[in-house]
Amino acid sequence: MHIRILGSAAGGGFPQWNCNCRNCRGVRDGSVAAQPRTQSSIALSDEGERWILCNASPDIRAQIAAFPALQPARRPRDTAIGAIVLLDSQIDHTTGLLSLREGCPHEVWCTQMVHQDLSEGFPLFPMLSHWNGGLRHRPIALDGEPFAIPACPRLRFTAIPLRSSAPPYSPHRGDPHPGDNIGLFVEDLDSAGTLFYAPGLGEVDEALLEWMRRADCLLVDGTLWRDDEMLVCEVGDKLGRQMGHLAQSGPGGMLEVLAKVPAARKVLIHINNTNPILDTASAERAELDASGIEVAWDGMHIQL
């Protein structure tokens, strides 16, 4: 299984266009040892020819430009993107569909709740129906059964409902439903390599831990270092848990969770611009290094 990190930042990217926090200011003027990042998205492939896009970032055009394997190479108009999987209906995970309209029709796999949000609150499905057939919805069931996507037939996907939040525009933002957010457990039938992918993760219970323990590689929510980070940095008024993100530090935080899991690789993705782990010289980054936890970067390639 080939895993390409197309984008590793949370919504807004890094640096965020209107943010003057220490990290964003520092990456612009070179005073912080950090590299810019686009908004979170990955691509998966079984053989490296056809790819499945997991979430469609607003930065998708730049991400394709940085990854030749997704670029047109066989016909005058062409793409190696064989399908798109949406793990939620967040703006920073779906807006890229607008930039992919010239390649319609696209197979878009998502839960019924995500499809509802993208048909009503942020109506991408009806909007894009005017472009060559638009988006063809392929439902993702929440029954725990593995499913295959024809573009990469040697991969098996299992959707895992997560405790997180629907996007702010959703009519059930404050009333969570199963399927608002999912994680993916992905298995390569040939190599037997396994991935657990959850860029938006608000809570980890024992059942979810069991899925995480089965994975060779964890690619999980790295949004915030501390739950009150947005308030401390004076860039927001919400706690991480109110936004559906489990902070890395503190009791029950992601560091404690990952310490319970034997995966060979533990990688944080969807990293907010305020998070001190973006600074490679920070004490927080040193703590991750000492724990064997990696920080995803744009262009990172993992093979399982």
From Swiss-Prot:
Matches recorded under SUPFAM superfamilies: Metallo-hydrolase/oxidoreductase
Keyword Transport: yes
Domain of life of the native organism: Bacteria
Keywords in alphabetical order: PQQ biosynthesis, Transport
Stretches of the chain forming a coiled coil according to its record: none
InterPro entries: Metallo-B-lactamas (IPR001279), PQQ_synth_PqqB (IPR011842), RibonucZ/Hydroxyglut_hydro (IPR036866)
GO term, biological process aspect, one: pyrroloquinoline quinone biosynthetic process
Pathway annotation: Cofactor biosynthesis; pyrroloquinoline quinone biosynthesis
Residues annotated as transmembrane: none
Family: Belongs to the PqqB family.
Functional summary from the UniProt entry: May be involved in the transport of PQQ or its precursor to the periplasm.
Stored HAMAP family: PQQ_syn_PqqB
Protein name per the record: Coenzyme PQQ synthesis protein B
Species this chain originates from: Pseudomonas aeruginosa (strain LESB58)
Gene: pqqB
